[in-house]
Swiss-Prot record:
Pathway: Glycan metabolism; pectin degradation; 2-dehydro-3-deoxy-D-gluconate from pectin: step 2/5
Induction: Up-regulated by auxin.
Main function: Involved in the degradation of pectin. May assist in the removal and modification of an existing pectin matrix in order to allow the deposition of newly synthesized walls polymers for a specialized function or to create an architecture that is extensible.
UniProt-listed SMART domains: Amb_all
Record protein name field: Pectate lyase
pH curve summary: Optimum pH is 10.
Organism: Zinnia elegans
Length: 401
């Protein structure tokens, strides 16, 4: 993860943005999710898709989606449900996939859009391949919306969310991300600073909150596909298609970084596909709801963690590899069994195929997992239909997406 030299006053003010205090009570969140889903169904009426995926059913069957893009912000669920992105801001159209100047970005480029102070809903004029020279450091209250076009960010450094809030990233391809840094990068119209070498993540979330990563296709990055660290919280990672990668997702900076104890992340309706090895996710300290995902490939393990994270696995489908000694879904790391047996890891309603098994630990009482519950999971038998369209969608104006 890159770091930047900031004035002390900017650093202090940013701590308020990245507070890692936990979200409201899980019961309140679940009630709000149900209210939001029901309201969305009423608003769509006969347009509702009926896939069982509450995010997709909220917006995808509206043929007028291109003229009502910001309605997407009503459809988030889970711990990141309050991520508004650039809602109520201007629509900003990216017209130039090149000219990536990290310090003085050119109007019309993606970098120029994401550093602005005002809320912006960012869309793209046409299909684009964007190869960045340095990390794309996002300012708060931004949506990157790739619907209706084919947008790739890759073959260079990729996306960083650093001391920011209210970010939505939707509908783009992120792949072949590389390390960069040791140079100046602008992160607002009024500030640029020196950034050290980045890790080469697809999306790096650092000390940020109210983040929603939805319907993206991610693969083959230098480090993680999506990493969230340093007190980041209130995050939903949903409907993404991930392939061809080793260390897929890290949630929590290190075993010694206790500020991640209040991290809350929802991982829902994703497809973990071919060529994946481990960390789907790898968790530390916080509270993680892994719900209604499709795990069709892993080489080492699917869900792991250390430093006593609370992991609630609900309604997922796990298809184990054919190799005899890699069928365990879980991996308790950096601790003897005498210690990890007390970590709260629970499997509820998961479908285990080809010999897959989940090694539970800790308490069985519902209260042990209350802070890791973020929505009402659906039966695992519905996972195939709920995740069938995971990844960046092919959407055409005037038609259902």
């Amino acid at each position: 993860m890159a770091t930047t030299i900031l004035p002390l006053i900017l650093f202090i003010s940013s701590l308020a943005i990245a507070s890692s205090s936990p979200s409201r009570t899980p019961h309140a969140i679940v009630n709000e999710v149900h209210k939001s889903i029901n309201a969305s169904r009423r608003n769509l009426g006969y347009l509702s898709c009926g896939t069982g995926n509450p995010i997709d059913d909220c917006w995808r069957c509206d043929p007028n989606w291109a003229n009502n893009r910001q309605r997407l912000a009503d459809c988030a669920i889970g711990f990141g449900k309050n991520a508004m992105g650039g809602r109520n801001g201007r629509i900003y159209v990216v017209t130039d996939p090149g000219n990536d100047d990290p310090v003085n970005p050119v109007p019309g480029t993606l970098r120029y859009a994401v550093i602005q102070d005002e809320p912006l809903w960012i869309i793209f004029k046409r299909d684009m391949v964007i190869q960045l020279r340095q990390e794309l450091v996002m300012n708060s209250h931004k949506t990157i919306d790739g619907r209706g076009v084919n947008v790739h960010i890759g073959n260079g450094p990729c996306i960083t969310i650093h001391y920011a809030s209210n970010i939505i990233i939707h509908g783009i391809h992120i792949h072949d991300c590389k390390q960069a840094g040791n140079g100046n990068i602008r992160n607002s119209p009024h500030h640029s600073g020196w950034w050290t070498q980045s890790d080469g993540d697809g999306i790096s979330i650092f000390a940020s909150k109210d983040i929603w990563i939805d319907h993206n296709s991610l693969s083959n990055c230098h480090d993680g596909l999506i990493d969230a660290i340093h007190g980041s919280t209130a995050i939903t990672i949903s409907n993404n298609y991930m392939t061809h990668h080793d260390k897929v997702m890290l949630l929590g900076h290190s075993d010694s970084y206790t500020q991640d104890k209040n991290m809350q992340v929802t991982i829902a309706f994703n497809h973990f596909g071919e060529g994946l090895v481990q960390r789907m996710p790898r968790c530390r300290h916080g509270y993680f709801h892994v719900v209604n995902n499709d795990y069709t490939h892993w080489e080492m393990y699917a869900i792991g963690g250390s430093a006593s994270p609370t992991i609630y696995s609900q309604g997922n489908r796990f298809l184990a590899p054919n190799t005899r000694f890699d069928k365990e879904v879980t991996k308790h790391e950096n601790a003897p069994e005498s210690e990890w047996k007390n970590w709260n890891w629970r499997s509820e309603g998961d479908l285990m195929l080809n010999g897959a098994y989940f090694r539970e630990s800790g308490g069985r009482a519902a209260s042990s997992f209350a802070r890791a519950s973020s929505l009402s999971g659906r039966p695992s038998t519905l996972v195939a239909s709920m995740t069938r369209s995971a990844g960046a969608l092919v959407c055409r104006k005037g038609s259902r997406c």
